């Protein structure tokens, strides 16, 4: 996994609105929001919110804004102000605005002024940072298709050991290390991007 893979997957979003809303809900859950209740991620009247939630016991609304290409601040601001109407409409204490857009600190402050400070803005960098936490690994895989090379390595090694235990891979005496065993161990200590290939190459050569 490259260091900016999560960021790039978010920036070049192709998942559509339903997936964006579900991913946004996961971000809120990771950031201390509770009672998250999506409204109509697959279409329909949403009552001015993509989801309802609570933060510190107070009602909040969520709005997800994911696009395939970057938007100018004017477009982001227009969307934010439109979603902001849902705060008063639903008697909420604030809005959690989750987006894949790059929004600078100064721009975020400008948006918060419209909300009288009652906003949490989860912009591209913040969302990527949350998703890159170790505990968010399954969420990255589910919504962004990002897998951990280590998982693939473990699977290849598990398959290799299973073949050995069934007697289908080695004709050498029990207790002696085979050439494949040595190659597997060596593969586990090199760069992660090379590990899978080395293990598979060792098995083919055996």
Language model features: what each stretch is:
Residues 1-206:
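Mixed-charge (Asp/Glu-Lys/Arg
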């Amino acid at each position: 996994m490259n260091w900016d893979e999560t960021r790039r997957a978010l920036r070049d979003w192709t998942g559509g609105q339903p997936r964006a809303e579900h991913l946004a809900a996961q971000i809120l859950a990771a950031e201390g929001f509770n009672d998250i209740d999506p409204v109509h991620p697959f279409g329909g009247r949403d009552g001015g919110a993509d989801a309802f939630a609570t933060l510190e016991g107070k009602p909040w609304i969520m709005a997800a804004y994911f696009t395939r290409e970057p938007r100018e601040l004017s477009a982001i601001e227009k969307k934010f102000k439109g979603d902001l109407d849902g705060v008063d409409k639903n008697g909420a204490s604030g809005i959690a605005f989750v987006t894949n857009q790059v929004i600078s600190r100064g721009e975020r402050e400008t948006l918060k002024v419209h909300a009288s400070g009652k906003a949490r803005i989860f912009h591209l960098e913040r969302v990527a940072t949350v998703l890159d936490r170790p505990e968010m690994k399954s969420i990255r895989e589910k919504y962004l298709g990002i897998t951990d090379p280590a998982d693939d390595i473990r699977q290849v090694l598990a398959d290799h050991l299973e073949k050995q235990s069934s007697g289908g891979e080695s004709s050498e005496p029990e207790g002696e290390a085979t050439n494949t065993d040595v190659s597997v161990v060596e593969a586990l200590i090199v760069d992660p991007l090379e590990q899978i290939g080395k293990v598979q190459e060792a098995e083919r050569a055996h």
